[in-house]
Amino acid sequence: MQIVLASQSPSRLMILRQAGVEPVIHPAHVDEDAIIAQLAGAEPDEIVTRLALAKAQAIAPEHPGDVVIGGDSMLLLDGQLQGKPHTPEATIERWRQQRGRTAHLITGHAICLGERRVVEASRTTIHFADASDTDIEAYARSGEPLQCAGAFTLEALGGWFIDAIEGDPSSVIGLSLPVVRRALYSFGLNASDFWTK
């Protein structure tokens, strides 16, 4: 039995590796925009967990005896969910909106083993620094935040611009180890069952 990560996120992979797990990487390809459109008006936690579940369910049939993890993260600011900015221009615009403010990073998790599944959202409060225009532009040009929910990273260059977080740091990076641990326990498994170190 293995852990299968339904993601190509380097951050999610890093979290698992640092926690002693070498997962199988099997990215799920789902139409996130279509799923979000179907969920118009849904609560933010519902949206991110449904995205995570779609990813896990897309590949779970190919891994019937393994633990499959799907995840998705979005930033909630002023009642609006924000995903990845994709461009330096969008990153700069977002940072000008969020600097000096507080927002919530919501990470949806879907952990499946056969027919059993645990679906849970983890919320972490992010206190953004009042970053200068020069730093915002340099950060956007670095390329680092372009594929990150909320246009930031906690574990790399973006760490300069986060004053504080309240909640689970691993969830901000992309995968809550406490959520995964609770799911494993509910399946009668232990985190240490998957350690390779």
Curated annotation (Swiss-Prot):
Establish whether keyword Hydrolase is in the entry.
yes
Q: What top-level branch of life does the organism fall under? A: Bacteria
| Name of a matching Pfam family | Maf
The record, for SUPFAM superfamilies, names: ITPase-like (SSF52972)
* Primary location group: cytoplasm
Question: Which GO cellular component terms are attached?
Answer: cytoplasm
Keyword DNA damage tagged: no
| NCBIfam families assigned | maf
* The protein's name: Nucleoside triphosphate pyrophosphatase
